[in-house]
């Protein structure tokens, strides 16, 4: 297996030959190389928290090179800025420069959650987002920033806002 394989989120376009019922086509998966196996490991999402999928600890080995080539790479879940105005259906438009959170459906369709300034000087992202097409992913610019942990658990160390997974 090539060591140039990129760890990250993918959309399956074919069922995984080794486990077609567990990993069907059109599914969001996390694919990672590990030190334990010469082949990438395919991990399924196991839940959503704050518009972000979490992934389990166990996965399926992907031994089929053609299957790996069929995967569609997806941008990481996290926070982005719109680089242009974006129409999200029914005439609704989101302005250029808007802070959004990117997530996915279980079948790996991209969803954006617009940020909204709330009382108390906080930004909130809705629990329901707007589906966007793959081509519209090009209108997102990643935001890299850090925030302090909540006061109850705060030490003073900053934690990444995390564009992880």
Residue ranges and their predicted role:
Residues 1-16, 31, 154-165:
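Low-complexity, Gly/Pro
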Residues 1-7, 69-78:
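N-terminal helix-cap/turn-to-beta initiation motif at the start of protein domains
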Residues 7-14, 76-85:
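Extracellular/lumenal glycan-associated surfaces
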Residues 9-55, 89-131:
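Basic/aromatic-rich interaction segments and small domains that mediate binding to polyanionic partners
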Residues 12, 30, 66-70, 82, ...:
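A structural signal for short, hydrophobic beta-strand segments that form beta-sheets
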Residues 21-22, 58-61, 79-81:
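A short linear-motif detector with a strong N-terminal bias
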Residues 42-75, 113-165:
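Intrinsically disordered, low-complexity, charged/polar segments
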Residues 72, 85, 89:
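Short, surface-exposed polybasic-aromatic patches that bind anionic ligands, especially phosphate groups
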